[in-house]
């Protein structure tokens, strides 16, 4: 529990397939809310290591979700969960950015530099590996979902072979993301009362 509210913390592993399996099981036990807390790489040098990104939706650049619904169906987070994450982050004085994120199966693909350029032009905030499944499979199982990510570095550095994650900043950002997620559940619980 967190401040007398029952909360479960679950590791799904890496990628959409394992996340989807966990979410489908949560749907069977009447889970109401699900918030993905994790790490991501930013699409812009202005979004720095340790900053948090709240995903409002996700590009479905992975192989799992199209097995459930066609690509024309968007992966979006629940507005109430997103607003609770924003409110909690503001209360906790967390540096946060909100917007679309890019879920991908492969960060080291030859297409990465072009994908990053397109993402920057489209205002994509970050690249990660699970959010589209969390949002879509959650929606299919009547679970309201959200996503908050701590930035560990700039994605373009990966394609240039210059990976220099800022572990200290990312850990601080992740701590803030966890606190914001926990406080979001308090907000959502009070809204449901």
Annotate the PLM regions.
Residues 84-92, 137, 180-188:
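Generic non-transmembrane alpha-helical segments
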């Amino acid at each position: 529990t967190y401040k007398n509210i029952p909360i479960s913390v679950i590791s799904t592993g890496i990628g959409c397939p394992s996340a989807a399996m966990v979410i489908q099981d949560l749907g069977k036990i009447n889970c109401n809310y699900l918030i993905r807390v994790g790490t991501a790489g930013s699409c812009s040098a202005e979004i720095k290591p340790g900053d948090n990104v709240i995903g409002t939706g996700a590009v479905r650049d992975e192989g799992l979700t199209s097995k459930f619904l066609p690509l024309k169906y968007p992966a979006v987070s629940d507005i109430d969960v997103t607003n609770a994450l924003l409110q909690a982050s503001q209360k906790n004085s967390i540096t946060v950015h909100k917007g679309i994120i890019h879920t991908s199966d492969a960060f080291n693909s030859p297409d990465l530099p072009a994908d990053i350029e397109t993402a920057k032009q489209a205002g994509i905030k970050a690249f990660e590996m699970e959010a589209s499944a969390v949002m879509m499979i959650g929606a299919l199982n009547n679970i309201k979902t959200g996503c908050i990510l701590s930035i560990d570095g700039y994605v373009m550095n990966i394609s240039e072979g210059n990976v220099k994650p800022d572990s200290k900043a990312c850990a601080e950002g992740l701590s803030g993301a966890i606190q914001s997620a926990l406080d979001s559940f308090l907000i959502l619980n009070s809204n449901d009362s």
